[in-house]
């Protein structure tokens, strides 16, 4: 199958959810994405803001690999975002405590296009319960889903809601993609993405990427 490498890039502006339990490999993967951001995003972001709840030593390595990252403790506000620049914002494990945050809802519903923002949510759960965040899971452009042995029902629920008619296919892809340590399934819901590239894994440049196609 011939694939245009440009079709594999994350198209700004976007929203992305990276979900999985503690220790599943979320932070490791996000660090690799940020290390390769010039190859993985189209167009390339001008500014990267990483919002965190607890400082981790791994952030220093991210900063060494990419000095353009600005780390902020807690939730970024709309006033801290320069809409004249292409912004990539990572919210690391901040969803639960900010589930009713007005800024979060405004950034999500209006931010992508109007404020020139791409949002990357790192969360332990696919579905965040809250008045301001209920729509995020069901309206995101990209999803990275790690293995969660304690709650397999989350993925089945997602498959039924987002890709009805393909539930069994997606469950099989999920099992295969998460079979290895730190394995994950990548789902692409961007409108312009070719249909045969919507379900993938190994998205980091240099990895042997895999595309799942329903027979």
Language-model segments: residues:
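Pre-Walker A adenine-sensing motif
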Residues: 1-10
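Conserved P-loop NTPase motor cores
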Residues: 14-39, 43, 53-58, 64-168
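An amphipathic, basic-hydrophobic helix/alpha-beta surface used to engage anionic
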Residues: 48
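Conserved GTP-binding G-domain of TRAFAC-class P-loop NTPases and closely related GTPase folds
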Residues: 134-215
């Amino acid at each position: 199958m011939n694939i245009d490498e440009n079709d594999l890039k994350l198209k700004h502006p976007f929203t992305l959810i990276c979900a999985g339990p503690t220790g599943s490999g979320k932070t490791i993967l996000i660090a690799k994405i940020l290390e390769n951001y010039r190859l993985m995003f189209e167009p390339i972001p001008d500014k990267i803001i990483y919002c965190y709840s607890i400082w981790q030593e791994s952030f220093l390595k991210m900063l060494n690999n990419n000095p353009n990252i600005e780390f902020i403790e807690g939730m970024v506000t709309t006033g801290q975002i320069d809409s004249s620049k292409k912004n990539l914002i990572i919210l690391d494990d901040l969803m639960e405590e900010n589930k009713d945050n007005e800024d979060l809802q405004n950034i999500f519903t209006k931010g992508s296009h109007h404020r020139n923002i791409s949002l990357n949510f790192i969360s332990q759960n696919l579905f965040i319960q809250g008045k301001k965040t209920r729509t995020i899971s069901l309206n995101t452009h990209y999803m990275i889903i790690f293995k969660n042995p304690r709650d397999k029902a989350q993925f089945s629920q997602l498959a039924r809601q987002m890709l009805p008619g393909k539930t069994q296919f997606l469950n099989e892809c999920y099992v295969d993609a998460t079979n290895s340590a730190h394995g994950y399934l990548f789902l692409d819901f961007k409108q312009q993405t070719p249909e045969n590239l919507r379900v993938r894994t190994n998205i980091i440049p240099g990895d042997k990427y895999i595309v799942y196609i329903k027979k």
